């Protein structure tokens, strides 16, 4: 007897339309909810940020703070009352969303117009740390917020030849107060920086093409990166803060715009230039699903805490998927 065919991938649970522009950034905010469900923030090529209710499946607010320039990154601070948005207008805006407000209360002028998204480390304290692309093409600037005080500039040695930083991930080990930064670079390397010491702890060559995005599971000390090439790289961090490549997963087509591990660390999703969303088991990297709904490049993916997956595309649509729900 032949083995039964696996069931076909599901259709989206629902689709959000109305951005009228390619979608470049997505972020769920559990702290800001409508009818008990998290709000979804989307950033578009036209410079607008839409705030969506998953209950009504409509945009409840539209924010316009980037002068028509593409919004590339979105992040809310703890409690969900403030939003950070990064645009190609060389501005990072801080929005006050408390009690229905939608005003820019501060901004940071960026030095680089590259593709690199910022990253924050905020533990519920009044002060938090922000990593942004720096003045030099290979620099990362570290700021203390909200004072915008410059902490340091992380600049590789001249002979490192890393190229531009393409993606950043600030994090902190549970047993330490020292901030660390994982950065993916144009030459295909992933680098671990000790921010306090302003030094490189470890560097690995993961990809032959620029690293477009990475995510890190601090509990398992294990990360994943995607590039402009045809492979995902899985790597780990040992107790001596040394990075090691653990394996690669070959893809059918090149180009990963974003890779995101679900909050429960069971599965991960990738946004593909080939219009596909790919879902993998995080521990084994077993492929679980290829979701072929969008008609143009998928540029961003995000998970809710309870496992709902959102994907934003160049086709101006945001698809929402319920896959392998959390137990």
UniProtKB/Swiss-Prot annotation:
InterPro entries: WD40/YVTN_repeat-like_dom_sf, WD40_repeat_dom_sf, WD40_rpt. One of its GO terms (cellular component) is cytoplasm. Its main location: cytoplasm. Keywords: Cytoplasm, DNA damage, Nucleus, Repeat, WD repeat. WD repeats lie at residues 16-54, 58-97, 103-145, 153-195, 200-237, 242-282, 286-323. GO terms for biological process: DNA damage checkpoint signaling; DNA damage response; social behavior. It comes from the Eukaryota. It is found in: Cytoplasm; Nucleus. Ubiquitous. Highly expressed in heart, liver, skeletal muscle, kidney, spleen, thymus and pancreas. Detected at low levels in lung, placenta and brain. Disulfide bonds: none annotated. Pfam families: WD40 (PF00400). SUPFAM superfamilies: WD40 repeat-like. Acts as a critical regulator of DNA damage response (DDR) signaling via specifically regulating phosphatidylinositol 3-kinase-related protein kinase (PIKK) family proteins. This is Guanine nucleotide-binding protein subunit beta-like protein 1. It comes from Homo sapiens. The gene is GNB1L.
């Amino acid at each position: 007897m032949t083995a039964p065919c696996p069931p076909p991938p599901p259709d989206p649970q629902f689709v959000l339309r109305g951005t009228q522009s390619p979608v470049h950034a997505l972020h769920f905010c559990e702290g800001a909810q409508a009818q008990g469900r998290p709000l979804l923030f989307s950033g578009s090529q036209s410079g607008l940020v839409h705030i969506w209710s998953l209950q009504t499946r409509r945009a409840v607010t539209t924010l316009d703070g980037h002068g028509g320039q593409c919004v590339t990154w979105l992040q809310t601070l703890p409690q969900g009352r403030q939003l950070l948005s990064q645009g190609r207008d060389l501005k990072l805006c801080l929005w006050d969303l408390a009690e229905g407000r939608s005003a820019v209360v501060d901004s940071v002028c960026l030095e680089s117009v590259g593709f690199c998204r910022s990253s924050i480390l905020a533990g519920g304290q009044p002060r938090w740390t922000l990593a942004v692309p720096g003045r030099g093409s290979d620099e990362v600037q570290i700021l203390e917020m909200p004072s915008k005080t410059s902490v340091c500039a992380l600049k590789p040695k001249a002979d490192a030849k890393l190229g531009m930083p393409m993606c950043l991930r600030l994090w902190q080990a549970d047993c330490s107060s020292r901030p660390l930064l994982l950065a993916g670079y144009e030459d295909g390397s992933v680098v671990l920086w000790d921010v306090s010491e302003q030094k490189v702890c470890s560097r690995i060559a993961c990809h032959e093409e620029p690293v477009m995005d990475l995510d890190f599971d601090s509990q398992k000390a294990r990360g994943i990166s995607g590039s402009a090439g045809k492979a995902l790289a899985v790597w780990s961090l040992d107790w001596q803060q040394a990075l090691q490549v653990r394996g690669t997963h070959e893809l059918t087509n090149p180009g990963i715009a974003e890779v995101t591990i679900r909050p429960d660390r069971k599965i991960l999703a990738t946004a593909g230039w080939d219009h596909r969303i790919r879902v993998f088991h995080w521990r084994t990297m077993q492929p679980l699903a290829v979701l072929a709904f969008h008609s143009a490049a998928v540029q961003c993916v995000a998970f809710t805490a309870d496992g709902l997956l959102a994907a934003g595309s160049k086709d101006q649509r945001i698809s929402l998927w319920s896959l392998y729900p959390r137990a």
